[in-house]
């Protein structure tokens, strides 16, 4: 879980475009965030298994 200060800092606009980085909307994790869903891989997996992300199905081939 991210510190509240880091989450608040991330919500402010960055001074330069290269300073901006993505954080998970659910838990605040800064690494391995899927931009399309704004979720980290851990939260994405949990919500996908529960069926709470529309259009996401388990791969089978």
Curated annotation (Swiss-Prot):
- Mind telling me which Gene3D superfamilies this protein's record contains? 30s Ribosomal Protein S14, Chain N
Q: Please provide, in alphabetical order, the Gene Ontology terms of the cellular component aspect for this entry.
A: small ribosomal subunit
* Cofactor comment text: Binds 1 zinc ion per subunit.
Question: Is rRNA-binding there in the keyword field?
Answer: yes
Keywords in alphabetical order? Metal-binding, Ribonucleoprotein, Ribosomal protein, RNA-binding, rRNA-binding, Zinc
Under the heading Pfam families, the entry gives: Ribosomal_S14
Q: Name one GO molecular function term.
A: rRNA binding
List the InterPro entries hit by this protein, alphabetically. Ribosomal_uS14, Ribosomal_uS14_bact, Ribosomal_uS14_CS, Ribosomal_uS14_sf
Q: Which cofactor does it need?
A: Zn(2+)
Can you supply a Gene Ontology BP term from the record?
translation
Where do the annotations place Zn(2+) binding? 24, 27, 40, 43
Q: Which family does it belong to?
A: Belongs to the universal ribosomal protein uS14 family. Zinc-binding uS14 subfamily.
Q: What does this protein do?
A: Binds 16S rRNA, required for the assembly of 30S particles and may also be responsible for determining the conformation of the 16S rRNA at the A site.
Q: How does it assemble?
A: Part of the 30S ribosomal subunit. Contacts proteins S3 and S10.
What protein name applies here?
Small ribosomal subunit protein uS14
Give the originating organism: Streptococcus uberis (strain ATCC BAA-854 / 0140J)
- List the taxonomic lineage: Bacteria, Bacillati, Bacillota, Bacilli, Lactobacillales
């Amino acid at each position: 879980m991210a510190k509240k200060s880091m989450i608040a800092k991330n919500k402010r606009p960055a001074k330069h475009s290269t300073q901006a980085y993505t954080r998970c909307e659910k838990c605040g994790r800064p690494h391995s965030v899927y931009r399309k869903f704004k979720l980290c891989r851990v939260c994405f997996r949990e919500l996908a298994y529960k069926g709470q992300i529309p259009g996401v199905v388990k791969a089978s081939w």
